[in-house]
Design a protein with these regions (language model features):
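Short glycine-rich substrate-engagement loop in P-loop NTPases that contacts/grips substrate
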Residues: 21-24, 75-112
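Pre-Walker A (pre-P-loop) alpha-helix and adjacent loop at the N terminus of AAA/AAA+ ATPase modules
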Residues: 2-50, 98-106
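Short alpha-helical
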Residues: 22, 53, 88, 149-150
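Eukaryote-biased feature marking scaffold/signaling PDZ-domain proteins and nuclear chromatin regulators
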Residues: 11, 40-42, 54, 117, ...
């Protein structure tokens, strides 16, 4: 029998059901700025799990939540959503990211926010290129995947 209840997309991070308490705590630490990002060569958050678990919904909430935790202000410049298509190449990804990072951010933190949805659809070369972009201190990257085993180990 089908559930006739309407689907309600989460509106806040508190609406997300996490797979384990450690994941929730990690996200809460990042959002509250207890764990700073970017810091010490870390500028990315990887969200993974099976289809329909809310990875993309959470990814869309995180940039504003992180900005509020850092500056108590909402985003002035919206995050960049990069929906990866099968075979998306390294030069395509890097050209887009570099073009955005070359501009000044008008967010109070000075950071750019990127959501790279279905990052496992990138070619291996594109994933390797992305690793170099993740070394920036001028951006926060939120990556989502259903297939963590298909990602370059450096991501």
């Amino acid at each position: 029998m089908f559930n006739k209840e309407p689907f309600h997309e989460p509106q806040t991070i508190n609406d997300i059901i996490f797979g384990n308490p450690e994941s929730r705590l990690r996200i809460e630490d990042i959002v509250s700025n207890t764990e700073t990002i970017p810091s010490c060569g870390k500028s990315a958050i990887l969200l993974y799990g099976v289809f329909g678990t809310g990875k993309t919904s959470l990814a869309k909430m995180l940039p504003n939540a992180i900005e509020q935790g850092k500056t108590s202000e909402d985003l002035s410049l919206p995050e960049e959503m990069i929906a990866c298509q099968q075979g998306f190449s390294g030069p395509q990804v890097m050209t887009l990211i570099e073009a955005i990072l070359s501009r000044s951010s008008i967010n109070a933190s000075g950071l750019h926010y990127f959501i790279i949805d279905e990052v496992d659809n990138l070619t291996k070369l594109a994933q390797q290129s992305l690793k170099s972009a993740l070394n920036t201190t001028r951006g926060v990257f939120i990556l989502t995947t259903n297939n963590v085993s298909q990602l370059d180990k450096g991501l």
